Structure formats: structure tokens, C-alpha cells
Regions:
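N-terminal Rossmann NAD(P)H-binding glycine-rich loop of SDR-like oxidoreductase domains
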Residues: 6-26
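NAD(P)H-binding glycine-rich loop region in Rossmannoid oxidoreductase-like domains
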Residues: 47-88, 96
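Conserved Rossmann-fold NAD(P)-dependent oxidoreductase catalytic core, especially the SDR/UDP-sugar
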Residues: 92-136
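Flexible, glycine-rich beta-alpha linker
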Residues: 114, 159-177
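Active-site Tyr-X1-5-Lys
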Residues: 132-159
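Substrate-positioning beta->alpha
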Residues: 143, 171-177, 191-213, 221-225
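Conserved C-terminal active-site "lid" loop/helix of NAD(P)H-dependent oxidoreductases
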Residues: 202, 262-307
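Mid/C-terminal beta-alpha module of Rossmann-like enzyme folds, strongest
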Residues: 214-279, 313, 317-320, 330-337
Length: 337
């Protein structure tokens, strides 16, 4: 990728920012597109959205490759907004990228595009199914992935990667939510907590995405799931996150039907009273927390020529170290006041 310029959309997010930083560290010039400054030193920020034609076209001008992560990622919200950002924004970005002469395009998707509510055990990257996907995010990401793969052509190669449950130090989503809710005694385990779940440590997710970009002559027109390949019981994983942060792990179990019913009620309440916060439970979340999600990674490893370098155990060591360092730094700050 030396000498090429790469656009990363959604670089103010956890994964997008890490992708942009990794490219810059490798000597690749990076431009970003998102609503607010990316915070990535050395990146050229274009402030805007994929739904705005002016900022979108400015972002792709003179670009060789695109890594598209920008999306509306919430459990609830206006279906029209999900469609505008995730589907129509992707459609327009693909068209503008092709018109600007972009030759490689990586669409960062999600395994939820092929999740129909039942356990996934050892499957590969099944085709995205918008009509069967669960929730507006999954439905619109599935539709967007189909658009992206349909745009694959000799002039612009397109591939899709689906990192699953990305986590690590500084993660504002999975780890932060688990730890925050556990610290308040609001993190019950749905079902037995024994459902096996694959995850992807942040550095491994970044490496996998960049491998898909490097190997796009092989990966174009196809979708790939990215995970550590080390499924763990979800209760064990959540407990490990909590212990790393010095928080008591969850011990209360809630039956799946109860969690689903609570989720259905919460969805109605949040539609009536929309706000910036997320509901404590949704039907989609209840399914995600009670069903297995682990994947066959053999095709991913072969086609991307990639293996996760960190994995779960080393990732947890790094998470513990990061929390320990943050605690020491906070204590030093208190003493200095």
C-alpha cells in the first residue's frame, strides 16, 4: 500500500480510529470522514457524513482505497435514519468512490447480517439476509453489504469483512458497557451464560481488515468473518472483563423468555421516549446474549493470509494492564491536586 492514499470512514470510532492509526504507522497517507475530528495524529480529517454529497465527494477525491466503517450502530432508533446512513450512505459512497477512480474498497460489516436468531456454531460467512436479520442495524448493514459486494468490478474491487465483538483497552462499547452495568449491579446473565461466543481483539480486527485490503485480488466479491477463533462461554468472558477492571462479575441469571419480554417493553418505551441512552435490554440483545456465535475461520485464514496475533488470553492480559495503569494514573492525579 506504499504510495497509496486510503480513506477511512468513521475514524472517530474505536475500530475506525485504530485502522487509521495502523495505516499511518505503516507509512500510508490517511484521510478520514466523520462528523467530528478523528483524534488520529497525522490523519487528514474531512468533517461530514456519508449522507452529505459535498463532504463525501471531497473525501474520495484523489483516494486509491476506501475502508468504510461509518454506520449508525445502536440497538434502537428511527428505521429511516438507519436506512439513510447504513444503506443509502453506503450506496452513494460506492458510486462516488468508483467515479473518483478508487480501485479498492473494504466494507466493514458485521456477523449480525446473517444472524436469524438461532445459534451459529462453526459456520462460515453465510450470505447476508436483510429480510431475516434481527433489528434495524443488522437489517440495514445486511442490505449495505449486498450493495457493496454487487459493486465489485474490474475497476473497483470490493470485499466485506465482519469482525465479531471487537474489544480491548479503551473499548467504549462492549467492555465499557459490561463493566459499567456490572459495577451498578445491572448486568444479569441471560440464560445460563454458557453460550459459546467468538470475539476479536482490537489489534487482531485491525490486522484482519488490512489483510483483506492487501489481499483484495483474492478477497474481492466475498465476505469474511474475523474472530480470534477461541470461543468462550459468554458468562466467562464477561466475568473476565469485570475482573480486569476490578469489578464484581455478574452472578444473577435471567431466563431468556423474561429477558426477551423485558426487551420488547424497553423497545416500546424507547420509541415513545427517545433519548441519547440505550435501553437496558432489547429482543435482539437477549438473543445475542443467549445464543452461540462461533465461526469456521479456515477460509478467512487462507484467503486473507492472516492469523490473529493476540487472541483472547493475551488480550485479557493487556486489558488488565491498561486498567491497572489507568488506576495508577488516576491515583497520581489525585495526589497532585
Amino acid at each position: 500500500m506504499t504510495g497509496e492514499r486510503v480513506l477511512v470512514t468513521g475514524a472517530s470510532g474505536y475500530l475506525g480510529g485504530a485502522v487509521a492509526a495502523a495505516l499511518l504507522a505503516a507509512g500510508v497517507p490517511v484521510r478520514t470522514l466523520q462528523r467530528r475530528p478523528s483524534g488520529v495524529p497525522g490523519a487528514e480529517d474531512v468533517l461530514g457524513t456519508v449522507t452529505d454529497p459535498a463532504s463525501r465527494r471531497a473525501a474520495v477525491e484523489g483516494i486509491d482505497a476506501v475502508v468504510h466503517l461509518a454506520a449508525k450502530v445502536t440497538f434502537t432508533g428511527d428505521p429511516a435514519e438507519f436506512a439513510a446512513v447504513n444503506v443509502e450512505g453506503t450506496r452513494a459512497l460506492l458510486a462516488d468512490a468508483a467515479a473518483a477512480g478508487v480501485t479498492r474498497f473494504v466494507f466493514v460489516s458485521s456477523p449480525s447480517v446473517a444472524h436469524t436468531g438461532t445459534s451459529i456454531m462453526g459456520d462460515g460467512a453465510a450470505p447476508a439476509e436483510p429480510s431475516r436479520a434481527r433489528g434495524e442495524y443488522a437489517r440495514t448493514k445486511a442490505a449495505a453489504e449486498l450493495l457493496a459486494l454487487a459493486a465489485d468490478s474490474p475497476s473497483m474491487a470490493v470485499t466485506a469483512v465482519r469482525p465479531h465483538l471487537v474489544w480491548g483497552p479503551g473499548d467504549p462499547q462492549l467492555v465499557a458497557r459490561v463493566v459499567d452495568r456490572a459495577s451498578k449491579g445491572r448486568l444479569p446473565l441471560v440464560g445460563t451464560g454458557a453460550a459459546l461466543v467468538d470475539t476479536c481483539y482490537i489489534d487482531d480486527a485491525v490486522d484482519g481488515i488490512l489483510a483483506a485490503l492487501r489481499r483484495i485480488d483474492v478477497t474481492h466479491g466475498q465476505a469474511y468473518v474475523l474472530t480470534s477463533g477461541e470461543p468462550r462461554p459468554i458468562g466467562e468472558l464477561f466475568s473476565a472483563f469485570c475482573r480486569a477492571a476490578g469489578v464484581r462479575p455478574p452472578a444473577v441469571h435471567v431466563p431468556v423468555p423474561v429477558a426477551s419480554a423485558v426487551g420488547a417493553i424497553a423497545e416500546v418505551v424507547w420509541r415513545i421516549r427517545p433519548g441519547d441512552d440505550e435501553p437496558p435490554m432489547t429482543r435482539f440483545l437477549a438473543e445475542q446474549l443467549s445464543t452461540a456465535h462461533w465461526f469456521d475461520q479456515r477460509r478467512t485464514h487462507e484467503d486473507l493470509d492472516w492469523r490473529p496475533a493476540v487472541g483472547v488470553s493475551r488480550g485479557l492480559e493487556r486489558l488488565r494492564a491498561a486498567h491497572r495503569d489507568a488506576t495508577v494514573a488516576a491515583g497520581a492525579g489525585d495526589l497532585a491536586e
